[in-house]
């Protein structure tokens, strides 16, 4: 409850005053990013692709494209993304999306600790900064179960997934540096799943992707 109240107060502080419409007051410093949190690690066994879905995903990652995967749970989507990042030494910023995902999770929110107040960046500006610091000038933002988020929360990703490749957080514009790429990979569950929302038209227009299916008995016998 305290965090929600503080977040509302912080948002109110960002609104311009009537006397000066351009005025903005930002009251807290932004916490530093620990880039070691986003180093890739290898997950489990190797993914066995059915056709060319893994190759297609890999190509999109290396080009810094937005890629959308629709498929049931348990197909190995998350494992494959992490293992491809490990293979190519690409830092990865993950988020498990849900109905409860808030704007603060994506953009950031004010926090308090024993040293005072600070602004904790969300995954969107964090992913941009991680990409800018990456040795290979590329990073991956992995948004699992993207369509579990409400429409207004989905829309908060628009400026990162379109040509702007930027986001404003705590009064600072976080922008990909020239030559730096950010691959945004999102997974969605089929519409038959509970707690699933439709994708906004904005999201549909910003991703390429494919539908993945469970292997058939014939596939398992290969």
Describe the residue ranges of each PLM region:
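AAA+ P-loop NTPase catalytic core and its hallmark functional loops
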Residues: 2-222
């Amino acid at each position: 409850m305290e965090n929600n109240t503080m977040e509302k107060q912080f948002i109110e502080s960002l609104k311009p005053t009537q006397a000066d419409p351009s005025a903005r007051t930002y009251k807290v410093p932004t916490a530093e990013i620990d880039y070691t949190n986003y180093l890739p690690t290898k997950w489990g066994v190797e993914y066995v692709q059915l056709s060319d879905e893994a190759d297609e995903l890999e190509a999109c990652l290396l080009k810094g494209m937005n890629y959308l995967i629709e498929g049931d749970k348990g197909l190995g989507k998350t494992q494959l993304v992490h293992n491809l990042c490990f293979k190519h030494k690409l830092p990865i910023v993950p988020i498990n999306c849900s109905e409860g995902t808030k704007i603060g999770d994506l953009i950031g929110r004010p926090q308090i600790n024993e040293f005072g107040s600070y602004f904790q960046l969300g995954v969107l500006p964090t992913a941009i900064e991680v990409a800018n610091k990456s040795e290979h000038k590329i990073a991956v933002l992995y948004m699992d179960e993207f369509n579990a988020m409400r429409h207004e929360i989905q829309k908060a990703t628009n400026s990162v997934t379109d040509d702007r490749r930027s986001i404003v957080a705590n009064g600072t514009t976080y922008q990909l540096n020239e030559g730096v790429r950010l691959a945004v990979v999102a997974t969605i569950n089929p519409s038959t799943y509970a707690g699933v929302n439709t994708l906004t038209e904005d999201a549909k227009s910003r991703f390429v992707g494919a539908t993945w299916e469970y292997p058939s008995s014939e596939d398992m016998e290969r």
